[in-house]
């Protein structure tokens, strides 16, 4: 696959030879392969999108008792522990450059996770997800040599403008919270950085190993910001076990289940098909935000979301045509 098209899909793993945030589409545990082997690959890809958004929506229930940073820290710590047990990565023989690359991927992952969580506390989840999606879309468009992609970039920009045209924000606020929008934009930048290092890490770590290491770095990076909040929230609560159970459940949904589903789907789908499917993720975010959190978008905002999704699909199809 040409270098110019590897980042087009906008998913957490953007190449046919990659999976999760770490690149390799290596086989996961045998039990996971057996459990998903008979499920159509497109269903797995769509299921992965739902696990992301359901996990994010569920995590909002932890914001009040643990704080946004605390809830994020707990989720990443649990996910890192689970993935380390599954992958059992070894750092022996890695060069300083390889370790720095996976560390940067982990920092981008931690930043993206924390910023996204902070954003959805202030603006609807569908808006945050759509703005964040500009990160991978921007990488795809920037790496393309096709003149038509300038038009898709303009369409995506129009979509963001339409998304911001809201009369009401969360909790009765007048319009969308500007800090929330800025946080979503910062999350998009983190996702773009995260994508750049995806393939590099996948070239030196097999299977789930790179994922386990990068998520562990993310957990350590967020710990100084959210560790104390999570600890005090758990210790001071009379529902400590329930909060811990929720944290485990959220982490198992995203990132653990998400990446396993995506890795399996990518082993059986072309990157072109996978890219088109994952371009629908902002729409899934709007649906989950409505069903789980009771959030709705104005018609003009839905039109903006449609512009971003259309730009992503068009960029994906255009790039695959260059292969």
Which residues make up each language-model segment?
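Glycine-/small-residue-enriched transmembrane alpha-helix faces in small-molecule transporters
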Residues: 1-70, 104-107, 111-115, 158, ...
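C-terminal-most transmembrane helix of multi-pass membrane proteins
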Residues: 2-6, 12, 16, 20, ...
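Hydrophobic alpha-helical transmembrane segments of multi-pass integral membrane proteins
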Residues: 40-44, 70-85, 149-158, 179-186, ...
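Hydrophobic alpha-helical transmembrane segments of multi-pass membrane transport proteins
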Residues: 46-58, 86, 103-118, 161-162, ...
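Hydrophobic/aromatic residues within transmembrane alpha-helices
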Residues: 62, 71, 75, 119, ...
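Specific alpha-helical transmembrane segments that line the substrate/conduction pathway
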Residues: 70-78, 117-147, 187, 271-290
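Hydrophobic core positions of alpha-helical segments in small-molecule transporters
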Residues: 74, 105, 131, 151, ...
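Hydrophobic transmembrane alpha-helices of multi-pass small-molecule transport proteins
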Residues: 83, 134, 148-169, 288-290, ...
